[in-house]
Each structure stands twice: as C-alpha cells, then as structure tokens.
Amino acid sequence: MKHVNVLLAGGASRRFGEPKAFVKWKGRMLYECAKEALGEQTVIISRPEFIDRFQENGENEVYQDAEPFQGMGPLAGIYTAFKKTDGDLYTVLSCDTPLIQRRTMLELKRLMIAGADAVVPISDGQVQPLIAIYHKRIMPVLYDQLSEKRLRISDLLGRISVCYVQAENIGANPAEFININTRDDFSCLEEKSNSLKRD
C-alpha cells in the first residue's frame, strides 16, 4: 500500500496571536520540528495566505483546502490530502506538535491492521486524532461530514473503525503530545523537551 505523510498547517492561530507554523524554536520553525517526525516526503495542507511562505522555505508540495471545504478545519485538511494525492494510508500530523518523535509515528504506522480505518494514540487519557494514521477509504465519510458541516473529528472517529493505542504501549513519552495553542504552551516547550531527553 502506498503511504503519504500529511502535515496540517491551516489553523488560524487566533489564541497564539501569529501563525504557529512559522514560530521559531531552537532555530527551526515549529512546522519543521513536526515535519521531522514524518520524513522528507511530506504534503503540507495550509491556508491560501501561507502557501508562498512555505514554498519560499523550500516546501514543494503545499495545498490549500479543496473546494468547497476551505477553512473548515482538520477534517478539510485530511480530505484535501486524500483528494490531491495518490495514496492508501495517510500519516497525519498537526504542525503544532513539535516534540512528537519519528519512532512514535512509525509505530503507529506499523500498528495499522487489516480492516481498521485508523490508528489513533491515547496519551494521558486524551485521544490524539491529529497524530494518527488514516486509510483513504474513509474519504466518503469525510465528504459527508464536511457537506453537513459536522466538523468535530470525534464525530468522524465514531463513524469509522479505529484502533486505539495507549501511548505508553508503544514507548511514547507523554511530552511528545504537547499541542501548542497559546503562548503559555510555547513557554513550556523547553521543560517538556528536557523530559524527553531524560526518557
């Protein structure tokens, strides 16, 4: 089966105050830190106003949300990746998860079993649907939800066959799953990063 890596970078970053994808941490943009966990061949889904900025940074495969679902959140981003690329399994990652490790993403990919539509980790009791693997066969379900403007990803998970994985069972540190939504989250990055080094 053909595998596609997808980085979602289309959020408005309202709570953060500026586009999170391009915020520098330890000399790299946050999206670059997340992308490292996916590998070199990565498709980026973003907002129209960010496309040029990604391309100026050397990213070649960058798309905006497919019509008619522009600006409709992560589900639109996943749908767009399905529509724009030729793949079967899609590793999906949000750009504001800079501490996620490549080994964790590879373990999730390894755990995709026959018949499952998705592999989704759970860390500290929290389901992590934007650090996950999805099969393209869910595309009609995605289309229906987007058409109905049902944008909660939890609704999607309730309609497909999901293999849930406890993060500790694949050797993942809870710190990997930090999601940068606010400046306070960003200020905690160093501490969380240090806990990864001690692991």
From Swiss-Prot:
Mg(2+) binds at residue 96. It catalyses: Mo-molybdopterin + GTP + H(+) = Mo-molybdopterin guanine dinucleotide + diphosphate. The keyword ATP-binding does not apply. It is found in: Cytoplasm. Keywords: Cytoplasm, GTP-binding, Magnesium, Metal-binding, Molybdenum cofactor biosynthesis, Nucleotide-binding, Transferase. Its cofactor is Mg(2+). GO terms for molecular function: GTP binding; metal ion binding; molybdenum cofactor guanylyltransferase activity; nucleotidyltransferase activity. Its EC number is 2.7.7.77. It holds the Pfam family NTP_transf_3. GO terms for biological process: Mo-molybdopterin cofactor biosynthetic process. Its main location: cytoplasm. One of its GO terms (cellular component) is cytoplasm. GTP binds at residues 8-10, 20, 65, 96. CDD domains: MobA. PANTHER family: MOLYBDENUM COFACTOR GUANYLYLTRANSFERASE. Belongs to the MobA family. Transfers a GMP moiety from GTP to Mo-molybdopterin (Mo-MPT) cofactor (Moco or molybdenum cofactor) to form Mo-molybdopterin guanine dinucleotide (Mo-MGD) cofactor. The N-terminal domain determines nucleotide recognition and specific binding, while the C-terminal domain determines the specific binding to the target protein. This is Probable molybdenum cofactor guanylyltransferase. It comes from Bacillus subtilis (strain 168).
